[in-house]
Amino acid sequence: VMKTFGMEAYFSLCEVAASHEEDKAEAILRTIVHGLSDKLGFTLLNDLRDPGVYRTFVMARNVGKEIHFHKEFLRFEELEGGILYAQIGPKNNIITFLMPHFADRLPLENFVIHDVKRNIFALHEAKKDWYLVYNPMGLDRIKYTVSDKEKQYSELFAAFFHTIAIKERENPTLQLNMLPLRYREYMTEFRQNVKTF
């Protein structure tokens, strides 16, 4: 696929494969068949007149947006052992797209990103590669405790978030457009109380 249609098409097809949509396999197949039959090469994704290519484009765009939002909105918390822990609950299976981003930016940290909906843990050990663990031996049932330092920082951050807001300029509609409700469940500044996992 990479040789025939280019890196952009390959990446888009990978995003579609991570989609939660039921017709993703059909869209991928129709896109590849269309590209091969019409010999479109690197211009495959530009042919949006084809229903398969268009469906692939729409799904890849939706997955790409969710990846982008999670890169912005993911919040790590320090656990008692010094490990950074983050929970996400994405619609699509995007954890493999997020890990290279965070592994590149946090190479000296031990961290875990937990996809709660799929029960997938992405683990990164400092100065090493990252890997995925699917439904490990009860990892989802272990009680994680947030460090005391993290509790203090979480409280300070939440207080900062709520006190910096200007009451007269509140715009909940705009806030919903910029930060949909489904991302807030896992964000420190929107939690009522700091909790242990």
Regions found by a protein language model. Name each.
Residues 1-197:
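Extended, well-ordered protein cores
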